[in-house]
């Protein structure tokens, strides 16, 4: 069992009350966001199934599909697409043209522009430069099993889709690609154009 708080310091505060393992959280993101929305203050306005803090900025032509929480001071750039249950903590930036699917982003993290983050848990103060991708599915493999390395041991994840678990303060360079099941500790650095494939195909 992975201890998510060793990667994301605020994990217990934000998601610790839910019994699911970190691997299962994205698959039930819609339900979790709906439950958390019941506890929101009157400082949030509801638009469809999206709950947006009054201090957040949502630019024109943003698509919000499914249950979404956009926290205080967040910025969502034009033509961004959020779907499938998304939680944005305080001060998160989603730049123009980004897609975020079934993911949790902690305080002050940023996707610069034209990023994809699928079925992922992204810690506090993480920065993803333009075009970097958190892939959530092995389209190119006949074996779709997702594996991760936890404390030096290869673990088979109990889900068919999972992107990345990104520790606080991680920096991800432009056009980098993180393969499904990537786990990065706090303060990691991924170089521009780098492919992270922690568990190669068998």
Tell where the protein language model's regions lie, with residue ranges.
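Glycine-rich hexapeptide-repeat left-handed beta-helix
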Residues: 102-202
């Amino acid at each position: 069992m992975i201890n998510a708080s060793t990667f994301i310091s605020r994990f217990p505060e934000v998601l610790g009350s839910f019994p699911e393992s970190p691997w299962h959280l994205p698959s039930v993101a819609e339900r979790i966001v709906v439950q958390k929305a019941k506890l929101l203050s009157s400082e949030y306005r509801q638009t469809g199934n999206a709950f947006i803090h009054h201090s957040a900025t949502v630019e024109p032509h943003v698509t919000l599909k499914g249950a979404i929480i956009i926290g205080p001071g967040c910025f969502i750039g034009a033509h961004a697409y959020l779907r499938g249950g998304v939680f944005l903590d305080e001060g998160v930036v989603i730049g123009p043209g980004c897609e975020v699917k079934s993911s949790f982003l902690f305080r002050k993290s940023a996707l610069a522009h034209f990023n994809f983050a699928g079925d992922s848990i992204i810690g506090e103060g993480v920065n993803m430069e333009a075009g970097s991708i958190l892939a959530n599915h092995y389209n190119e493999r006949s074996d779709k099993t997702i594996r991760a390395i936890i404390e030096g041991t290869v673990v088979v994840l109990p889900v068919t889709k999972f992107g990345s678990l990104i520790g606080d303060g991680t920096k991800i360079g432009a056009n980098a690609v993180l393969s499904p099941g990537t786990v990065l500790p706090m303060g990691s650095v991924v170089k521009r154009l780098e492919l992270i494939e922690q568990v190669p195909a068998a």
